[in-house]
């Protein structure tokens, strides 16, 4: 099945939809027939351009809603704008997140609070708002939260980030269970190392990586490459569509590692302190 018409007549909200994985998901949903899509992001120029191209190339009505997800007021405006424009929400994808580095020793209270505001609180209230519309309109909707393989424990330099993704995983399961009688499905993807503009930026900013860092990174992976947004978008579309049936409450690992398996012990790169 090529998925054509899979989302015909449906309206989706995709956070982080102005670049990387979020943009790939939004484009795929439109390609597969979505009649409306709302994308969010912080860069207004980029967001307006993505929305315009979704409308011109995909034929859907597309809106960009600028949103700083650390600001709860801006978070709550996202679904409200979608409801105002379309009168419904069928699909929600929480793809936006921050991945700022920090160990148990150097993570500041400010970074910790921002991490949980963007990565946990924002998805929570976006789900709350979307579910309220789904219930009002009697929609058997679907929600996908983008998590991380780091939610299994994570790296020493991603302590708060890993905790935030673990928290969102627990919320995913709780909300999926809570909405069983309403036939609203909630699932998540634990994605691994992915080739996105955001990853390129943080590799240079946080790790002083050279311009060609991805060449060596991909050479060292089992499949000879990092994950690509388009393939993860297809997995998200599966979870959002009728193809996944009654699947709900699942946290799916999407990576080229197998959690809990390895031929050498995992050790931090260096002692802290």
Model regions and ranges:
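Alpha-helical segment proximal to the catalytic Tyr-Lys
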Residues: 132, 177-181, 245
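Short, small/polar-rich loop/turn modules that mediate ligand/substrate recognition or access, typified
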Residues: 93, 180, 185, 247-249
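Conserved glycine-rich cofactor-binding loop
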Residues: 11, 18-19, 43
């Amino acid at each position: 099945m090529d998925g054509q018409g899979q989302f015909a007549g449906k309206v989706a909200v995709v956070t982080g939809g102005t670049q990387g994985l979020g943009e790939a998901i939004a484009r795929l949903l439109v390609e597969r027939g979505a009649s409306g899509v709302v994308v969010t992001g912080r860069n207004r120029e980029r967001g307006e351009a993505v929305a315009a191209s979704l409308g011109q190339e995909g034929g859907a009505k597309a809106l960009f809603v600028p949103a700083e997800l650390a600001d709860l007021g801006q978070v709550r405006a996202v679904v409200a704008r979608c409801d105002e424009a379309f009168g419904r929400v069928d699909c929600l994808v929480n793809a936006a997140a921050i991945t700022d580095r920090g160990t148990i020793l150097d993570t500041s209270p400010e970074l910790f609070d921002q991490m949980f505001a963007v990565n946990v609180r924002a998805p929570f209230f976006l789900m709350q708002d979307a579910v309220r519309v789904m219930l009002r309109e009697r929609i058997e909707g679907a929600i996908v939260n983008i998590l991380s393989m780091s939610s299994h424990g994570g790296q020493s330099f991603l302590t708060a980030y890993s905790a935030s993704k673990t928290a969102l995983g627990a919320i995913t399961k709780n909300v999926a269970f809570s909405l069983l009688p309403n036939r609203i499905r909630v699932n998540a993807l634990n994605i691994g190392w992915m080739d996105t503009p955001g990853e390129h930026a943080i590799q240079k900013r946080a790790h002083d990586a050279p311009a060609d860092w991805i060449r060596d990174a991909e050479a060292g992976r089992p499949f000879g490459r990092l994950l690509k947004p388009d393939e993860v978008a297809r997995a998200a579309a599966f979870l959002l569509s009728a193809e996944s049936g009654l699947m709900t409450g699942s946290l799916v690992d999407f990576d080229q590692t197998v959690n809990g398996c390895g031929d050498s012990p995992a050790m931090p790169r260096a002692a802290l302190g």
